[in-house]
């Protein structure tokens, strides 16, 4: 038996602003948006009674590849003054298969994201042994999560 990792939930400062970023940059859609009170047991953040809001966004599937945005409403969760400028141990790297890597980067830039790497052409040998020509770029979202965005341009036989 193999389990599916269906969602990654991110702590965000402003749920609406974060959701709009994912909707505009990657074309994701809101799947769920609900307030809830923490039990103080299962989640290793906050404490019992904290009022939060969970927004879940989906791309092409409603079982895998979803992103949750968790905002503390009361009390507000303290956020760092400065967002990361490099990836540290323990921080996730989100890898996106995009139909338009250049467009995603420009949309992210327009919404205020910090850009790490402008679109560049590169090649990789896939698990099937075929060489794939790619366009890749990378940037941070508005809460400091890092995204590597890749677009397959051509698969060689």
Residue ranges and their predicted role:
Residues 1, 9-10, 33, 67-68, ...:
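Vicinal oxygen chelate
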Residues 4, 50-51, 90, 133:
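Exposed loop/turn and edge beta-strand positions of beta-sandwich/beta-sheet ligand-binding modules
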Residues 6, 55, 92:
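Residue-level detector of short, conserved catalytic/binding motifs and their immediate flanks
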Residues 11-64, 110, 130, 154:
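Core segments of cupin and vicinal oxygen chelate
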Residues 62-64, 75, 101:
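Short, charged/polar surface micro-motifs in flexible loops or helix N-caps
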Residues 83-84:
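Glycan-recognition patch characteristic of GH18 chitinases/ENGases
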């Amino acid at each position: 038996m193999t389990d599916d990792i269906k969602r990654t939930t991110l702590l965000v400062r402003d749920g609406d602003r974060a959701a709009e970023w994912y909707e505009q940059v990657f074309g994701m859609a809101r799947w769920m948006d609900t307030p809830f009170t923490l039990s103080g047991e299962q989640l290793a953040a906050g404490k019992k009674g904290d009022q939060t809001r969970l927004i879940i966004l989906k791309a092409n599937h409603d079982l895998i590849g979803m992103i949750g945005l968790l905002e503390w409403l009361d009390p507000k969760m303290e956020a760092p003054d400065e967002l990361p400028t490099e990836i540290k141990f323990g921080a996730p790297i989100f890898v996106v298969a995009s139909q338009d890597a250049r467009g995603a980067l420009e949309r992210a830039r327009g919404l205020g994201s910090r850009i790490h790497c402008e679109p560049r052409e590169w090649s990789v040998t896939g698990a099937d042994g075929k060489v794939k020509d790619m366009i890749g770029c990378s940037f941070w979202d508005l809460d400091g999560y890092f995204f590597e965005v890749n677009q397959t341009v051509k698969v060689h036989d």
